[in-house]
Amino acid sequence: MKIDSWLNERLDRMKEAGVHRNLRSMDGAPVPERNIDGENQTVWSSNNYLGLASDRRLIDAAQTALQQFGTGSSGSRLTTGNSVWHEKLEKKIASFKLTEAALLFSSGYLANVGVLSSLPEKEDVILSDQLNHASMIDGCRLSKADTVVYRHIDMNDLENKLNETQRYQRRFIVTDGVFSMDGTIAPLDQIISLAKRYHAFVVVDDAHATGVLGDSGQGTSEYFGVCPDIVIGTLSKAVGAEGGFAAGSAVFIDFLLNHARTFIFQTAIPPASCAAAHEAFNIIEASREKRQLLFSYISMIRTSLKNMGYVVKGDHTPIIPVVIGDAHKTVLFAEKLQGKGIYAPAIRPPTVAPGESRIRITITSDHSMGDIDHLLQTFHSIGKELHII
């Protein structure tokens, strides 16, 4: 059998199930109004929560670094890829996250995989939230430790699992801070309380919380007033740049530098990306206006959709999942949205469980009241047309 024939059979099964995906061609910077596949659309699926990815101050910082350092780092940090900008950004992240040190990775995905595949040993166990991001799941799979999954943000189940795993040498509780598909916030205060009681370590992926949650945007740690052992994050969402990081004690960072394969064998992110991210943290620390505007939008949209009769998941975050259920109907809903100039793709299995297909709205501070009015009016009309509300 030719490989294409076999692969086509597998692709056909995905199409029949309504879970086949395609790329969309987008022109211009990541702002709300974009040209997608030749049509003008208002984007409601971007992680650019504070609008910093197109902020002139970040662009200027990156351009200045480009002139001095060029377009790429051209090597691993441990060979020729290290620069003063990498070190400046790591110090900035550690200061922002209130940790001793931080280490950059090429993405948040690689940061999660690097930490979880290198830190726990074979006599250890990882307790992982059921809805953790794929990068955390893959890190657990690559780890030498066993993995036990607990029900999503269910603290009773987590405590039961902690009771059942006391034979292990060390235990690591790993969780997203904000869950990317459900928009829920991990109860980090309760998790850390349990960790102290059962002598476990806590690892938090703060990808969707960094720059967003907490009075100063520090993330879920500030939101709950607690300090996890390890914080992982990305620079590609609210920070508006590229790359990922891990933050914690100086000893932990030294360990990663010597053990995390996704750090050792990766080409470093370009210095220009570091300069842009560094400027983003300066902006986040200096002003709360963008966050305040963002959360006013969140309240407005969540309340309106619930009042229409939609099933809206999640907590008070920029991620608003509107559950449709059937994958085919969800795709149709997304197509009708796009026909009205709204880009919010369908989220289907395997990203979410069967029967949980949804339109995942993400809000940014760059959206306007006109954008919001159009979004809500369109959701109301399509929901009525498809007999969802």
Curated annotation (Swiss-Prot):
<feature type="binding site">
    <location>
        <position position="180"/>
    </location>
    <ligand>
        <name>pyridoxal 5'-phosphate</name>
    </ligand>
</feature>
<feature type="binding site">
    <location>
        <position position="21"/>
    </location>
    <ligand>
        <name>substrate</name>
    </ligand>
</feature>
<dbReference type="InterPro" id="IPR004723">
    <property type="entry name" value="AONS_Archaea/Proteobacteria"/>
</dbReference>
<comment type="subunit">
    <text>Homodimer.</text>
</comment>
<dbReference type="InterPro" id="IPR015422">
    <property type="entry name" value="PyrdxlP-dep_Trfase_small"/>
</dbReference>
<comment type="pathway">
    <text>Cofactor biosynthesis; biotin biosynthesis.</text>
</comment>
<protein>
    <recommendedName>
        <fullName>8-amino-7-oxononanoate synthase 2</fullName>
        <ecNumber>2.3.1.47</ecNumber>
    </recommendedName>
</protein>
<feature type="binding site">
    <location>
        <position position="351"/>
    </location>
    <ligand>
        <name>substrate</name>
    </ligand>
</feature>
<comment type="similarity">
    <text>Belongs to the class-II pyridoxal-phosphate-dependent aminotransferase family. BioF subfamily.</text>
</comment>
<dbReference type="GO" id="GO:0009102">
    <property type="term" value="P:biotin biosynthetic process"/>
</dbReference>
<feature type="binding site">
    <location>
        <position position="133"/>
    </location>
    <ligand>
        <name>substrate</name>
    </ligand>
</feature>
<dbReference type="InterPro" id="IPR015421">
    <property type="entry name" value="PyrdxlP-dep_Trfase_major"/>
</dbReference>
<keyword id="KW-0663">Pyridoxal phosphate</keyword>
<feature type="binding site">
    <location>
        <begin position="234"/>
        <end position="237"/>
    </location>
    <ligand>
        <name>pyridoxal 5'-phosphate</name>
    </ligand>
</feature>
<feature type="modified residue" description="N6-(pyridoxal phosphate)lysine">
    <location>
        <position position="237"/>
    </location>
</feature>
<comment type="function">
    <text>Catalyzes the decarboxylative condensation of pimeloyl-[acyl-carrier protein] and L-alanine to produce 8-amino-7-oxononanoate (AON), [acyl-carrier protein], and carbon dioxide.</text>
</comment>
<keyword id="KW-0093">Biotin biosynthesis</keyword>
<dbReference type="InterPro" id="IPR004839">
    <property type="entry name" value="Aminotransferase_I/II_large"/>
</dbReference>
<dbReference type="GO" id="GO:0008710">
    <property type="term" value="F:8-amino-7-oxononanoate synthase activity"/>
</dbReference>
<dbReference type="GO" id="GO:0030170">
    <property type="term" value="F:pyridoxal phosphate binding"/>
</dbReference>
<dbReference type="InterPro" id="IPR001917">
    <property type="entry name" value="Aminotrans_II_pyridoxalP_BS"/>
</dbReference>
<feature type="binding site">
    <location>
        <begin position="108"/>
        <end position="109"/>
    </location>
    <ligand>
        <name>pyridoxal 5'-phosphate</name>
    </ligand>
</feature>
<dbReference type="Pfam" id="PF00155">
    <property type="entry name" value="Aminotran_1_2"/>
</dbReference>
<dbReference type="InterPro" id="IPR015424">
    <property type="entry name" value="PyrdxlP-dep_Trfase"/>
</dbReference>
<feature type="binding site">
    <location>
        <begin position="205"/>
        <end position="208"/>
    </location>
    <ligand>
        <name>pyridoxal 5'-phosphate</name>
    </ligand>
</feature>
<keyword id="KW-0808">Transferase</keyword>
<dbReference type="InterPro" id="IPR050087">
    <property type="entry name" value="AON_synthase_class-II"/>
</dbReference>
